[in-house]
A protein has these predicted regions:
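Primary detection of the long, small/polar-rich alpha-helical "axial" segments characteristic
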Residues: 1-254
Length: 254
């Protein structure tokens, strides 16, 4: 009869609505596919692509920062060794030293120079050594800065094998040699100090970009949520109402 048909149609509509609400609660999404809202779904998908892109950019920046930070650690250690070398050179500048003492001081000085060589060789991360390689060679840091892949943060190689190791060429075999070594140490110390300033600035710049990208990603994620997320409190209330309606519909049919 007509009443039964109307009750059946109403129950079918209730069941359909119930299925939609349950799907929104289960997925947490009001717009789960383009069938729900093509405009919102398309925009959300594009924004999800941006979030994924920012994640890749941040991976590049993190690799760059780690490379720079390893170089900073190496340069700081070299700075400490240079201070020890300067103390040895000052000792050796004493013209009254006996031969045995000068030989011992020179041996210590040579060992410190070798330590610098080891530090330079060890200051590598992920195959890149900013201290060892010369300024024109490959391997320098070039990290993606943003979704615009042509925008990068670059950090040049510092050529310490030439600017530090080779520059410390004089030993402490005589007072004259010690005086020359002191001049070399002062020159190299200035180079290392300048390098630390350059690398520190680069590390802070990368860190700042990482922070900005993280905030940008959070804002985009929030925007995606505004477009497609379900209001779970509202949907839960709908679910309860539809369940009651469904029960009444079943009773009406019976």
């Amino acid at each position: 009869n007509t009443g039964a048909m109307a009750a059946l149609q109403s129950l079918n509509q209730t069941n359909k609505g119930l299925a939609q609400v349950q799907s929104r609660i289960n997925t947490g999404l009001n717009v789960a596919s383009t069938k729900d809202d093509s405009a919102s779904f398309t925009i959300a998908q594009s924004l999800r692509g941006d979030v994924g892109g920012l994640s890749a950019v941040n991976s590049s920046l993190n690799r760059g920062k780690s490379t720079v930070d390893v170089a900073i650690a190496g340069a700081e250690q070299i700075s400490d060794v240079l201070n020890q070398m300067k103390a040895k050179a000052i000792q050796a500048s004493d013209d009254g030293l006996d031969a045995e003492s000068r030989t011992a001081i020179n041996a210590d000085y040579t060992a410190l120079k070798e330590q610098i060589t080891t530090i330079i060789a060890s200051s590598e991360f992920n195959g890149t050594n900013l201290l060892k390689d010369d300024a024109t060679s490959t391997g320098k840091v070039s990290a993606l800065q943003s979704l615009d892949t042509t925008s990068t943060i670059g950090v040049a190689n510092q050529a310490f094998e030439t600017n530090v190791t080779t520059a410390l060429g004089t030993g402490l075999g005589s007072k004259a040699d010690a005086d020359t070594a002191l001049t070399e140490i002062d020159t190299v110390t200035a180079t290392v100090t300048s390098t630390l300033s350059t690398l520190g600035s680069a590390s802070r710049k990368i860190e700042g970009q990482l922070s900005f990208n993280s905030k940008l990603s959070d804002v985009i994620e929030s925007g995606i949520g505004n477009l497609v997320d379900a209001d779970l409190a509202k949907e839960s209330a709908k679910l309860q109402a539809l369940q009651v309606k469904q029960q009444l519909g079943v009773q009406a049919l019976s």
